[in-house]
Structures are given as structure tokens and as C-alpha cells.
């Protein structure tokens, strides 16, 4: 790690890797270019993933059930990412975790269980497409390791004494646990001996359609903001709903549950999709709404005649 940081902070001959010193947030007292920042995030996630894999392997050797071992490995990987966030004084180090963990784990779970049934293949297709879309959007909007998302800087300023507790449990661990709960229905597909049925395919289609909605919403938002900075995006999907990207995210996890329900019926595993819906409706959307109302005078009028979701 230290050699990577040294590489990214070489002298003027490495101008493509190092930018000027302003707006510095990390402990190295230097802000890296986007390319080096993305590479650094990748290294961090490899370290976190390796730590989680070692713990999972050890716990399963102790005869712990695989699902519980995976949960604890997920928690450990989150703590590792959180630790690097502390090192760089940037909670945004955690941001890609949401889109990276599910597709990677679902794929590794197929190798772990040796199950490559049609429902599992449908699950992998859906989650890798979704993960590609979400990670791609993160890569487009990511400004570098020296930039922290406005939500986190807001919490820093509002709760300076409690921030690190909020950081670990509220900003890192809660999303990890909600995503894990939403993933559980998908993990059960590896146990099913039944073949896919029409509802399984419908669930996959819901997932693919949801990720496509998000992809379209991303493109429309990026294009609009580039052409009309500071204005409210009210074109395309955004004309019909204030948060089409969040709508797609919520719907995606319901699609995963539909795939599960097609084989097992309705039971307690519906809780993951419900928790995901509650997270967006109770936290993510209200936070975004408050920011938009504060920063864009015409957002109030847009809010009055546009539904919250599509």
C-alpha cells in the first residue's frame, strides 16, 4: 500500500497521477487524480475481500453455518473499508461497497456450492448487470479520494463528537446489513432443487428492467446537469418521478425476492426487500429532498407536480 501511495505522489514528472494540493482531506496531505483514486479504492477492496474470505474460510472450518459465516465476513470486510475511510478521512471510500459485494458474492457462492442451476444463472445475470450499472455510475461521479459526499460532510458538521459512531454504524454497517438482508432470498436459490418457472423469469426481468431504468435515469441526469447546471432535471424519466434511480434500486431488490418467491413462496425473507424500501423512503429520499429544496429554488414547484417515484 505504501508503495502505491508513493507512486501516486511522485514529482512533477508524474503530473498525470498527482494533482495540486488544494482541498486536501486525506492523511497523506495530498489529493490524487481520479485514476489513482480509483486504483486505490480497488486495492482497498481487494484487501477487504481477502480479509473477509479468510474469516469465512476459518469460520466454516469451525462448523459455523455458511450463511452466518458469510454475514460475519461481510461485517469484517465493511470494518476494513471503514478503517481505510478513517485513514483517508473520507467516508466515501465505502460508497462502491453497495454495488460490488452482491454480484461478487453471488458468483463466489456458485463456486462454493457448486450450484449452477437456471435460477442461479438468472440471478447472476441480473446482479452483474445491476452491479455494472451502479459501479459505472459511481466511477463517473467519483471525483477522487480527496472528495467526500455531501451527506457525510453534513453529518461531520452536525455531529462532530458522535460522527465516528454514526460513521461506523449508520453510514457503513446499516447499509451493509440491509443489503445482506436483501441478498438472502437470492442466496436461497442455491438451495433450491426446482427448475426455474415463469415467475422466476419474471423476477429476473424485473431486475433487468430496474437496472435499465437506473441506467437511463443516470444518462438523462448527467446530460441535463452538464447542459443546465444548477437547474432541476425534469426531462425523460425525471419528468414523471423525482427519483427514478431510487425507484429502480427498490424495484431491483423486489425482483430478487420475486425470483425467490417463485420457488419458495411468501415467507420471512420478504423482510430484506421491505428493509431496502424503508431505507430509501425513510432516509435516502428525505435527505436528497431536503438538499434539493435548499439548493434549487424551483425544486419546490417541481416537487408539487411530480410524483416521488415513477
What are these regions (language model features)?
Residues 3:
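Cationic, low-complexity basic patches in intrinsically disordered or flexible, solvent-exposed regions
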Residues 6-9, 13-19, 23-26:
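Short, positively charged and aromatic/hydrophobic N-terminal segments
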Residues 29-36, 85-97, 139-149, 156-174, ...:
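Interhelical loop and helix-boundary elements at the membrane-water interface
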Residues 34-60, 66-68, 74, 78, ...:
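Hydrophobic transmembrane alpha-helices
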Residues 66-90, 151:
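Short secondary-structure boundary segments
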Residues 80-82, 99-102:
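Non-catalytic, usually N-terminal nucleic-acid engagement modules in DNA/RNA processing proteins
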Residues 91, 101-104:
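General structural concept
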Residues 149-156, 228-234:
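Juxtamembrane inter-helical linkers in multi-pass membrane proteins
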Amino acid at each position: 500500500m505504501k508503495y502505491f501511495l508513493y507512486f501516486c505522489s511522485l514529482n512533477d514528472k508524474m503530473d498525470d497521477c498527482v494533482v495540486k494540493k488544494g482541498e486536501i482531506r486525506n492523511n497523506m496531505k495530498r489529493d490524487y487524480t481520479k485514476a489513482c483514486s480509483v486504483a486505490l479504492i480497488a486495492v482497498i477492496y481487494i484487501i477487504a475481500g481477502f480479509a473477509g474470505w479468510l474469516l469465512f474460510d476459518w469460520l466454516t472450518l469451525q462448523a459455523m453455518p455458511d450463511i452466518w459465516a458469510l454475514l460475519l465476513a461481510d461485517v469484517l470486510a465493511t470494518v476494513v473499508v471503514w478503517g481505510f475511510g478513517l485513514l483517508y478521512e473520507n467516508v466515501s471510500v465505502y460508497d462502491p461497497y453497495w454495488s460490488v459485494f452482491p454480484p461478487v458474492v453471488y458468483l463466489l457462492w456458485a463456486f462454493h456450492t457448486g450450484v449452477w442451476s437456471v435460477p442461479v444463472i438468472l440471478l447472476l445475470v441480473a446482479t452483474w448487470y445491476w452491479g455494472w450499472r451502479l459501479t459505472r455510475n459511481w466511477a463517473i461521479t467519483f471525483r477522487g479520494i480527496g472528495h467526500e459526499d455531501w451527506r457525510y460532510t453534513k453529518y461531520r458538521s452536525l455531529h462532530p463528537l458522535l460522527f465516528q459512531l454514526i460513521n461506523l454504524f449508520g453510514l457503513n454497517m446499516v447499509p451493509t446489513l440491509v443489503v445482506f438482508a436483501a441478498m438472502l432470498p437470492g442466496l436461497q436459490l442455491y438451495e433450491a432443487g426446482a427448475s426455474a418457472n415463469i415467475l422466476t423469469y419474471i423476477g429476473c426481468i424485473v431486475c433487468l428492467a430496474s437496472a435499465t431504468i437506473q441506467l437511463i435515469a443516470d444518462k438523462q441526469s448527467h446530460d441535463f446537469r452538464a447542459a443546465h447546471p444548477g437547474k432541476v432535471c425534469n426531462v425523460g424519466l425525471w419528468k414523471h418521478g423525482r427519483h427514478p434511480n431510487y425507484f429502480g434500486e427498490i424495484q431491483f431488490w423486489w425482483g430478487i425476492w420475486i425470483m425467490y418467491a417463485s420457488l419458495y413462496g411468501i415467507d420471512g425473507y420478504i423482510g430484506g426487500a421491505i428493509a431496502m424500501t424503508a431505507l430509501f423512503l425513510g432516509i435516502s429520499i428525505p435527505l436528497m429532498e431536503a438538499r434539493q429544496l435548499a439548493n434549487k429554488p424551483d425544486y419546490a414547484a417541481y416537487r408539487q407536480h411530480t410524483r416521488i417515484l415513477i
